[in-house]
Amino acid sequence: MTKRTRTLLGSLAAAAMISLVPMSGANADGYWQCVPFARLMSGIQIFGDARTWWSQAAGKYDTGSAPKIGAVLSFKPTARMNLGHVAFVSQVLTDRVIQVTHANWSVIEGDRGQIEKDVTVVDVSDRKSVV
């Protein structure tokens, strides 16, 4: 199977999975958090706050700085985002531009806990500082 075929199949599988998730962002309590959504989309069985995903993945899952469809992008915690954030990589446009599908990032129509599809993310980091 060629790389292009694998990429296409991965994209189709991701699209099929996304189509099964209600875009209103409703889980049992009507509100999506990023962690259960990323786990549902990726199949990666890591639990706990988003800020712990990178360290928990070590030795269990492939990790790196090269984007791949189906991977989970892990954001380090910051002062405003102290639990970190995780997002499902839905498209790779270039080595520094991807699209993610994630939950509980933006306030949409006054509500948090919503799902956003194919949001563009640009890597502006100094490559030397990327793990």
Q: Where is each model-derived feature located?
A:
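Short solvent-exposed strand/turn elements
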Residues: V97-V121
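A mature extracytoplasmic/lumenal domain signature
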Residues: P77-A79, Q91-L93, H102-S106, D123-S125
